[in-house]
């Protein structure tokens, strides 16, 4: 089947010579198979893949095909639909966004296209602000430079959830050849009012909304200039919006890492533009030590995720995990709302099923409900929309362990601009009390327990890798796991079958979440591990968590637990 697809591409009158030339130069049969054995699929992050020729690659044809499916879906479900499109600093992002825009315009869908790169959360905001029926961001988030991607948003500004994604993919799969993809020239699209370039008006509205999320306004007005911040946009789209928000709030002491300031899809200072990686902060650390900075921020290329390093004193800085930053923000937001008399009775904090249980302890302390959703911020965005529709709950904060955070409800995806603003305010608050952000974290641990999490990613690329991941999880699903190193398994949660099983009493109940190929095992000491395929990369992810009685104890416990769990996982691979 892949051979036939390969030949179809070579013989197509639509495919350009550059793409055909790339295909002809492939001498490895396995490489041809990998490029054509499937079409790119929607995962937790939408469409994502290596840039290149082939049906399983990101190129203007696969982008246009997906977009034609999206256009057909929109025209079937809405009258006179419109779509907002943004893109990040990656190679081919601008070209892919233009290809998508022209396919939509040719299909009669009005397009609002940003005239230059913008963060993903700004796109989410613009969908709502412009009353669009959909949105597209061309980005591969934090993936290596050879990747690009394409995230689709619904009329509420959130990433499309499973039902809508399935309909869009189904519509795209009905397109059997590239001749069915509509196109139009840019000039004609503009002339017909089907393509409108946007920019500053949206930026201004968005910036005002972000600034309005400040909780302790007097503190910020009085002391913002005292906080020393080092910021790196890691060659991405965050540079202008993050610095603009901070500057307008009075944070005068923000210095950017010059070598990582300019947008650049080759990411020349790093192999992996991921704020989870300590390596991306090496240049920022040098600056921070010279400036005695209070905090370091780094945002990924599409500026929806943020990494944080905090000053420990004596010229040392500690990188916070996504879970640690989430705990600090959960506590800061809830305590500040309570102190200022703004904490609602029906408030909710939302986290994903692989995110720290420490947040539950904090929320319970403030009588705030905490809600678990599947991995992927789109499920948090979906809940915000449900709350706004029913009016029975008030969204306060949401986060996931992979460095994504959101306060406010005018954006429906994780937002590193909002997070940077809140983390700056939080750092300022603790500084005024004479303690660092790290000391504040230790106080939380002392109060609620020393939670420690870890993540093991097992890379298994290509068709064979994908099959191995599926087989491993299926094998684990069928295995009756009673204990890990002598510690009993209390609960097994199978999110694919949507069954929560009490392993002690053999009782079962339904999980009220959409089906997803995820397994979670909770042990009697409160530790747990989760296994799932990555939705955006050729990896299997194993999440681990323990709760210790000290930092040292938690560190040793997570290592012991990881060894035992990975021996179980590896035996299934």
Predicted feature locations:
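An N-terminal, well-structured beta->alpha segment
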Residues: 2-100, 107, 189, 195-225, ...
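Gly/Ser/Thr-enriched, mixed-charge loops and adjacent short helices
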Residues: 31-36, 40, 148-280, 288
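Conserved phosphate/anionic-ligand binding catalytic regions in large, soluble enzymes, centered on
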Residues: 36-56, 140-141, 233-245, 301, ...
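Short glycine-rich or small-residue beta-strand-to-loop segments that form or flank ligand, phosphate
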Residues: 82-88, 228-231, 406, 545
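N-terminal small/polar loop signature for handling phosphorylated ligands or for N-terminal nucleophile
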Residues: 84-147, 248, 252-308
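Short Gly/Thr/Asp-enriched flexible loops that form oxyanion-binding sites at enzyme active sites
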Residues: 96-104, 147-154, 304-324, 359-362
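Phosphate/diphosphate-binding loops
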Residues: 115-176, 274-298, 327-333, 348-359, ...
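Phosphate-binding and adjacent anionic-ligand microenvironments
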Residues: 293-295, 316-318, 336-532, 539-541, ...
